[in-house]
Amino acid sequence: MAKKSQIAKNKRPAKFSTQEYTRCERCGRPHSVYRKFKLCRVCLRDLAHKGQIPGMKKASW
């Protein structure tokens, strides 16, 4: 879980575009965040298994 100060800092607009980085909207994790969903891989997998992300299902081939 991200610190409250980091979450507040991330919500502020950055002065330069290079200062912006993705962070999970649900848990605040900074790594392996899918831009399309704004979720980290852990949260994305959890929500997909629960069926809360429309159109996403487990792949099998």
From Swiss-Prot:
Residues where Zn(2+) binds: 24, 27, 40, 43
Gene: rpsZ
HAMAP family associated with the record: Ribosomal_uS14_2_B (MF_01364_B)
GO molecular function: rRNA binding; structural constituent of ribosome; zinc ion binding
Alphabetized PANTHER family for the sequence: 30S RIBOSOMAL PROTEIN S14, SMALL RIBOSOMAL SUBUNIT PROTEIN US14B
Organism: Ligilactobacillus salivarius (strain UCC118)
NCBIfam families according to UniProt: PRK08061.1
Subunit composition and interactions: Part of the 30S ribosomal subunit. Contacts proteins S3 and S10.
Cofactor: Zn(2+)
Cofactor info, note text: Binds 1 zinc ion per subunit.
Role, per record: Binds 16S rRNA, required for the assembly of 30S particles and may also be responsible for determining the conformation of the 16S rRNA at the A site.
Superkingdom, natural source: Bacteria
GO cellular component: a single term: small ribosomal subunit
Signal sequence, renumbered to the chain: none
Record GO biological process: translation
Name recorded for this polypeptide: Small ribosomal subunit protein uS14B
Annotated keywords: Metal-binding, Ribonucleoprotein, Ribosomal protein, RNA-binding, rRNA-binding, Zinc
Protein family per UniProt: Belongs to the universal ribosomal protein uS14 family. Zinc-binding uS14 subfamily.
Family annotation (InterPro entries): Ribosomal_uS14, Ribosomal_uS14_bact, Ribosomal_uS14_CS, Ribosomal_uS14_sf
